């Protein structure tokens, strides 16, 4: 896929998890941004510890790269528990989940990434495990098959997903805590970049960190990736210190503009404007026009463009906004100007 080569792709690339782990916060005190989530989790974790209970099962959702795995690690660390990690696509059979859960110790945190991709068979097994800490397993086949119940120790399930709408109601309803991660503001991202630079031994001033933050699409994973590339540029083209000017030169070289857009974003916006007259246009037609999959547009490209006000999602399809036209120095259609007038 084309977007896998994007430096601003919010999904983790191969080997990147190991690199990111080195700069990942280990506690809520180190956790930057997401103030509502941080405050709520401090209360929920503190209360569970005071009672001597496991934390309620927790669902974390939001766009990729915002720290869902990081939050799962922090929950385990704050609870003084071990973290066992897996993902929805890996758990193909009921036996896969049973093998994992029978090895849990009291208080353990089980993290299932991409939980929306669990198979229905595995999901059915998960219900009694979450609700009653029991595992129903079928032994044998055919008429001789019988069900046995296994008692599980109290544990906390942390589920992560980028597509909460795909979760079934029975699964979603079994989570006592539901947290949505939002895109980060520039101030918080600047602090994240400065912290990562310090841990990586990169000489960087605050204006340099802010320049990287501005182009990181509100996403810490992208910020850390851009930081590594800017560091490389500074070491080869300068004295190794990342200033605003060095960051600007490096990011321009990488074709990441002042809004954090790359060639894919610009292509999507220009296709919407030039081929479809600014819209509205259906997402399938848009996907065909740029030779991408529908899921790529909905999960990778659109969220940030919508959040920044460059695209509108309407019942009739996607539409380019005034900001999109202005970004490319194009004349804004009269209809868009009229729609934006007060009282219209």
Swiss-Prot record:
GO terms for molecular function: ATP binding; ATP hydrolysis activity; four-way junction DNA binding; four-way junction helicase activity. It is found in: Cytoplasm. Residues 4-184 are annotated as: Large ATPase domain (RuvB-L). DNA binds at residues 294, 313, 318. Residues 258-344 are annotated as: Head domain (RuvB-H). It catalyses: ATP + H2O = ADP + phosphate + H(+). SUPFAM superfamilies: P-loop containing nucleoside triphosphate hydrolases, Winged helix' DNA-binding domain. The gene is ruvB. This is Holliday junction branch migration complex subunit RuvB. ATP binds at residues 24, 65, 68-70, 131-133, 174, 184, 221. HAMAP family: DNA_HJ_migration_RuvB (MF_00016). Homohexamer. Forms an RuvA(8)-RuvB(12)-Holliday junction (HJ) complex. HJ DNA is sandwiched between 2 RuvA tetramers; dsDNA enters through RuvA and exits via RuvB. An RuvB hexamer assembles on each DNA strand where it exits the tetramer. Each RuvB hexamer is contacted by two RuvA subunits (via domain III) on 2 adjacent RuvB subunits; this complex drives branch migration. In the full resolvosome a probable DNA-RuvA(4)-RuvB(12)-RuvC(2) complex forms which resolves the HJ.
């Amino acid at each position: 896929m084309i977007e896998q080569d994007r430096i601003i792709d919010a999904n983790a690339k191969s080997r990147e998890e190991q690199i990111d782990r080195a700069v990942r916060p280990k506690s809520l005190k180190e956790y930057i941004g997401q103030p509502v989530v941080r405050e709520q989790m401090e209360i929920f974790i503190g209360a569970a510890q005071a009672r001597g209970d496991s934390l309620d099962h927790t669902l974390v959702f939001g766009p990729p790269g915002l720290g869902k795995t990081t939050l799962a690690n922090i929950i385990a660390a704050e609870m003084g528990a071990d973290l066992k990690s897996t993902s929805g696509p890996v758990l193909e059979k009921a036996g896969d989940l049973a093998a994992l859960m029978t090895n849990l110790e009291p208080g353990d945190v089980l993290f299932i990434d991409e939980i929306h991709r669990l198979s229905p068979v595995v999901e059915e097994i998960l219900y009694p495990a979450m609700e009653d800490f029991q595992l129903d397993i079928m032994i044998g086949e055919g008429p001789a098959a019988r069900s046995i119940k296994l008692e599980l120790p109290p544990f906390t399930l942390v589920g992560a997903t980028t597509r909460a709408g795909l979760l079934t109601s029975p699964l979603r309803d079994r989570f006592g805590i539901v947290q949505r991660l939002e895109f980060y503001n520039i101030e918080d991202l600047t602090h994240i970049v400065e912290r990562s630079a310090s841990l990586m031994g990169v000489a960087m001033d605050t204006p340099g960190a802010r320049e990287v933050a501005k182009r990181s699409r509100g996403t810490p994973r992208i910020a850390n990736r851009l930081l590594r590339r800017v560091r490389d540029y500074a070491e080869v083209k300068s004295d190794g210190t990342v200033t605003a000017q060095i960051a600007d030169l490096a990011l321009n070289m990488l074709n990441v503009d002042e809004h954090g857009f790359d060639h894919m974003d610009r292509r999507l916006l220009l296709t919407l404007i030039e081929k479809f007259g600014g819209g509205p246009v259906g997402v399938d037609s848009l996907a065909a026009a740029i030779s991408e999959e529908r899921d790529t547009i909905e999960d990778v490209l659109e969220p940030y463009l919508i959040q920044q006000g460059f695209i509108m999602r309407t019942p009739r399809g996607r539409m380019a906004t005034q900001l999109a036209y202005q970004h490319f120095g194009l004349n804004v259609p009269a209809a868009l100007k009229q729609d934006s007038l007060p009282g219209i």
